[in-house]
Regions:
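Domain-level detector for trafficking modules
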Residues: 74-144
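Compact alpha/beta protein-protein interaction domains typified by the UBC
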Residues: 10, 14-87, 95-96, 162-202
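Short secondary-structure junctions and interdomain/linker hinges
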Residues: 16-20, 108, 112-116, 161
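Charge-rich (especially acidic), low-complexity segments
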Residues: 123-263
């Protein structure tokens, strides 16, 4: 008989200082003793539910964490946002993956302990909220292809894309891309092309040699367009995410939260 996802995580839970309290059907409750570096132990009663081979987890009652907090990656139903499910969701079909799932839960809860002290999410490389994460991923991939400096700048929030109208060319809409406050290139948004494809590429791969023209440097002209487009969509979807939550009450456990501006 093939073990279910819940049975697999239950079979290895003791390795992660957890024990089964109840397990029936597609629901189980675990008591996890989270030990921190300072010796403090935080008991978590975790409710885990399965949907096929995928698992979701929440605190049984909001004792250690708020019941909802986008800034702390706690969904509206109280489940933990452990990863971006569309790309990174774990399919628990073996004990190896079950252990990886527990490691992910442990890392998440340790980060939550840090949030309690810092009053902000400690990891700068976190996923954006909701559908914005899809475009964040696309932007990161494009930045990576353009060179490590671009990827680092993007992760440090030093890539800014501004839309404006061209002074000439019938006021066409363009996206201007700034990296560390320096305007590097612009993109025609109606044709998805870099405005000046003859400019020197900014990827840095030429070393001491004169950089190649952007249009002739690998696929970097296309990557530059993808970065600009994805960054704009990322910001658009992030704004839509927060707009949809207008009226929800802020839990007050982080210093910066868009919900604080609400009623």
């Amino acid at each position: 008989m093939i073990a279910t996802a819940l049975q697999l995580v239950a079979s290895v839970c003791a390795e992660f200082s957890a024990q089964v309290e109840t397990c029936s059907g597609n629901r189980a409750v675990f008591l996890l003793q989270l030990k921190l570096a300072d010796g403090t132990t935080i008991p978590y009663h975790l409710e885990v539910t399965s949907d096929g081979d995928r698992l979701s987890v929440r605190e049984l009652a909001p004792n250690n964490l708020p019941g909802f907090c986008p800034q702390r990656h706690i969904n509206g139903d109280g489940t933990f946002c452990l990863y971006w499910a569309a790309e990174e969701g774990l399919v628990v079909t073996t004990d190896v993956v079950a252990r990886e799932w527990w490691r992910t839960v442990w890392k998440y809860l340790k980060q939550q302990a840090r949030v309690t002290k810092l009053r902000k999410w400690p990891d700068d490389a976190e996923w954006a909220h909701g559908e914005a994460a899809r475009y964040q991923k696309q932007a990161l991939e494009a930045a990576s292809r353009l060179g490590g400096a671009f990827e680092e700048a993007l992760q440090n929030s030093e890539v800014v894309v501004k839309t404006t109208r061209a002074r000439r060319y019938a006021q066409r809409l363009i996206a201007q891309v700034f990296v560390y406050d320096q305007h590097l290139y612009s993109v025609w948004l109606d044709s998805d092309k870099v405005v000046n494809r003859k400019q020197r590429c900014f990827c840095g791969s030429s070393g001491n040699r004169k950089p190649a023209r952007l249009k002739a440097c690998h696929d970097h002209a296309e990557d530059a367009v993808k970065l600009a487009q994805s960054k704009l969509r990322w910001e658009e979807k992030e704004n839509e995410f927060w707009a949809a939550l207008k009226g929800r009450q802020c839990c007050g456990t982080t210093d910066i939260c868009p919900l604080k501006d609400g009623p």
